[in-house]
Amino acid sequence: MYLIADWRRTHYSEEVIPEMDGQEVILMGWVHSIRALGKLAFVILRDREGTIQAVVPKQKVDEETFEIAKKLGKEDIIAIRGKVVANEKAPKGFEVIPIEIRVLNKADAPLPLDPSEKVPAEIDTRLDKRFLDIRRPKIQAIFKIRSEMLRSIRKTFADEGFIEVNTPKLVASATEGGTELFPISYFEKEAFLGQSPQLYKQMMMAGGFDKVFEIAQIFRAEEHNTRRHLNEAVSIDTEMSFVNEKDAMAMLEKVVYNCYADIEYNRPQEIELLELNWEVPEKTFDKVTYTEAIDIAISKGVEIEWGEDLSRAAERAVGDEMGGLYFITEWPTQTRPFYTLPHEKDAKVCKAFDLMYKELEISSGAQRVHKYDLLVENISNMGMNPDSFETYLEAFKFGMPPHAGWGLGADRFAMVLTAQDNIRECVLFPRDRQRLTP
């Protein structure tokens, strides 16, 4: 066994090219596969960026190096110092001839999961051994695209003058008056894990921040057991002052469009590896009102009445009709939280919107109520006690500007971008009703 000592990686696998013929490199990673054929051994080393072939001919390396190569096992951690040799017959037009191989750590055998993807495994097995599962190139591709998604979103917000904030995740009461909260013991009191940063975002509008965003965990104690829901999720939230719901939708369009464009430019290998049918959307998305969506659903045989939230069957019907990215706007006020602003011409309809991808809701937003009296009235009308929202409501007494915002589900958006049909594929260590480990 060797320590890393004075060695440091000089290149990732994808950085080595045939034009480096004769150059010495140091590579580090996992043994993806090993073949020993008499006086010749082939070692495929895998790192974060891909794989690279090292050829170990007995007549060209010292005896110790050849013996080390023959005894390597799958997923051993190794470092190779060697020379690049151009070879048109090699998989990438070159190979690496080791000068020295250091075994940094051995992997036990047999492996509980095959990172080479030759042996398929069910998702529960893969999640149980997630540290091995994420060694698979296709799984890494999902999370590289997710990482680029988040980088792009932060850049767009920064370019548009937004301030990044962090809001509490330990709260005293429900954000939206719901019961789907995880209670925890907080010294002598009961507290809850935050289900949304909504109230804090609005309080910051009273503070004069104008434009804020947050990317953070939210927690919802909903007993869903579907491919679209998790109990711990990452939400991308924003709030803007002196705007209406149309401005908020335009900002959401910009964020989503830039994600597609940036991923196309910066992650072409991952797009190819996942065999994605990649298409950057138009800069503005189609829009359909809630009433029009209901009409579409009914025309396709779905039983639903105006004023009901869209059922799964209705979402599928509308998604089949609309396809791709589109907004559903002008929702019934009764279906939305108390802080949603009713339409001035018809209070039964509010200035809310959902961004959909086919049948999947990925974002929800609205123009908010900014008048104190109306907010108190809405809270009471929904059967809640305004006193429970005292610190929130106080922000509306002393100069709250008109404002709007939205929340975008990072995990669901990653599902869309990577064409996965299970949200758990897009979360490193998902938390659902059954899963609390690893």
From Swiss-Prot:
Lineage of the species this protein comes from: Archaea, Methanobacteriati, Methanobacteriota, Methanomada group, Methanococci
What's the protein here called?
Answer: Aspartate--tRNA(Asp/Asn) ligase
| Annotated site residue numbers, Important for tRNA non-discrimination | P91
Q: Where does Mg(2+) 3 bind?
A: E361
What are the binding positions for Mg(2+) 2 in this chain?
E361, S364
Q: Which organism is it from?
A: Methanococcus maripaludis (strain C6 / ATCC BAA-1332)
Q: Where does ATP bind?
A: R220, A221, E222, R228, H229, L230, E361, G409, A410, D411, R412
Summary of subunit composition and partner proteins: Homodimer.
Record's cofactor remark: Binds 3 Mg(2+) cations per subunit. The strongest magnesium site (Mg1) is bound to the beta- and gamma-phosphates of ATP and four water molecules complete its coordination sphere.
> What's a Pfam family in this record?
tRNA-synt_2
> Which UniProt keywords are given for this protein, alphabetically ordered?
Aminoacyl-tRNA synthetase, ATP-binding, Cytoplasm, Ligase, Magnesium, Metal-binding, Nucleotide-binding, Protein biosynthesis
What the protein does comes down to: Aspartyl-tRNA synthetase with relaxed tRNA specificity since it is able to aspartylate not only its cognate tRNA(Asp) but also tRNA(Asn). Reaction proceeds in two steps: L-aspartate is first activated by ATP to form Asp-AMP and then transferred to the acceptor end of tRNA(Asp/Asn).
Asked if Acetylation is a keyword of the record, the answer is no
* Positions that bind L-aspartate: E176, R220, S364, R368
The enzyme's main class, written as a single word, is ligase
Q: Cite the EC number.
A: 6.1.1.23
Q: Which reaction does it catalyse?
A: tRNA(Asx) + L-aspartate + ATP = L-aspartyl-tRNA(Asx) + AMP + diphosphate
Annotated Gene Ontology MF terms? aspartate-tRNA ligase activity; aspartate-tRNA(Asn) ligase activity; ATP binding; magnesium ion binding; RNA binding
- Tell me its family: Belongs to the class-II aminoacyl-tRNA synthetase family. Type 2 subfamily.
Residue ranges of the region described as Aspartate:
198-201
